[in-house]
Amino acid sequence: MDLTNPVISLCMKGSRAEFEGRQEDARNLYWQAWELAKDDYDACIAAHYVARFQIEPEDIFRWNQAALTHADKVQEDSAKEFYPSLYLNMGRSYELLGNHTEAKRFYDLAARLGFEHQAE
């Protein structure tokens, strides 16, 4: 991961703000990252973080789906490391929407990559 990439830098700052309890700062930093995204790799990362601050299940789904769609368009392997998290988030999105069949499918995809879903 290129830590000099401005989108990644903004998302890291957003994560730091989020973990420090500065939710509004985190939200703003993630939106800045989304607005700054120049390619599918950047958009994948930014959408992944923007999804975290959505309230409605449909919006959570839409942003998680955008992250996965952008990851699928990245030509090189740079987005490969994000797939387990993207699949888990898609599983959770489908779960929130009541589509347990699709949720399980995405949880299974994540599990094949070595990440198990932990029920809440």
Which residue stretches match the model-derived regions?
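TPR/TPR-like (Sel1-like) alpha-helical repeat modules
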Residues: 62-72, 96-118
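Conserved small-residue packing positions in alpha-helical repeats and bundles
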Residues: 14, 48-51, 84, 91
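Flexible helix-coil transition and linker loops at the boundaries of alpha-helical arrays
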Residues: 1, 33-40, 71-80, 116-117
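Helix-adjacent hinge/juxtasegments
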Residues: 44-80
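TPR repeat positional signature
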Residues: 10, 44-47, 87
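TPR-repeat structural position
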Residues: 23-24, 57-60, 100
